[in-house]
Amino acid sequence: MSTRFLRVCVLTVALAAVAVGCGSSKSSSTSSAAAASSTSATSTSSGGTSTPGISVTSFTNDFSAMNALKPLAASGKGKVAAILPDTTSSTRYVEFDAPYLKKAAAAAGLPSSDMTVENALGSDSTFVTDAESAITNGATVLLIDPEDSGTGVTVQRYAKAHGVAVVDYDRLTLGAPAGTADYVSFNNVHVGQLIGSGFVQCVNQWHVSKPNVVVMHGAVTDNNATLFAQGYNGVLASYFQSGKYTLVARTAGTWMPPDALTEFEGAYTAHHNINSAVIPNDETGAPIISYLQSHGVKPKTFPTTGQDATLTGLQNVLSGYQCGTVYKPIYLEAQAAVALAMYLRAGKTAPDSLLNAKTVDPTTHVSVPSSLLVPEWVTPANMNDTVIKDNFVPASQLCSGKYAADCKAAGITS
């Protein structure tokens, strides 16, 4: 996403508790943004030392803003270790997060030997072991994205006992002791709101007169899934209450694509009138769309949604099987996380323009200092100006084979 799409979150967001999956996993969160300073500003640490100022609006796809952090990299001590969750729930961790985190660290002046990125491959025990090993090997800052909060709490407690700073990367760890971590992510309730409003717009544009909807969810152990659901359920509530839409089924929730397909097949088999689906990400939506295609569903007749702007998701959007996808420019998130790590590693206080929000942990009611970025809803109408312009997905890949005509219709040239 180009910088004109990035805005600082300036509203207080009050989130109602919602049922996630078949149970009643309730969660609420609030955030508020502080005013942003310019890149050239300076901030003063708790020790009175002048440090480079940086804002969530500073970051661009050329990583140039990270240059301002070189003095912090030079004065800081120890290594920065990032631990990512898996390779299956989303392609982002391998394709984008890992290389972007390394690129951001290099641009900030951190030697490659002082920046490590590990992937736990879906194993909670591996995640904890990776964190402990990183600390043993000299990490003074951890960037962690565990699949569940229990694992995150274990890591945060171990890190605190060893004097290591922690940044929750992309997911907030619920139930963590106060003051053990900061948080970097996109505004995840807004992600859900984009999914919900995109679905509504699509229902209208595709002329689905009587939407019979299955609402799907991410894993119930993932706080992000809860926040996404709060967003789209909030948008859709009035449509269900008024009878304009019919809520036919809700699924239990998963980030595993085969399991998501199984959940959808169960609902679709039990309710043949289902003609639309709210799906929280592209990876879980892909097998569902393939299933619908194999059952003769035509383009622009069965609205579905997604998130992460994967290659397959974008192609499904272009071909009329998915309404749109939430684009979260991961290069922005990676830079924000590494920037925060540079302050922590140097023992400095990050400016309010970087930690621009507070996120309330619904289990402890602790306010967690947060850096929140703003996502974008992508359709064929703005695909060229977002994911293609950013080279998030190369046009040559997007427009290959049978998608060439769809790209041409959307004004995308490879």
Say what each PLM segment does.
Residues R4, C22-S414:
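A residue-level marker of the well-folded mature domains of exported/periplasmic proteins
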Residues V10-A16:
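Hydrophobic helical h-region of N-terminal Sec-dependent signal peptides
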Residues M1-C9:
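Bacterial N-terminal signal peptides that target proteins for export
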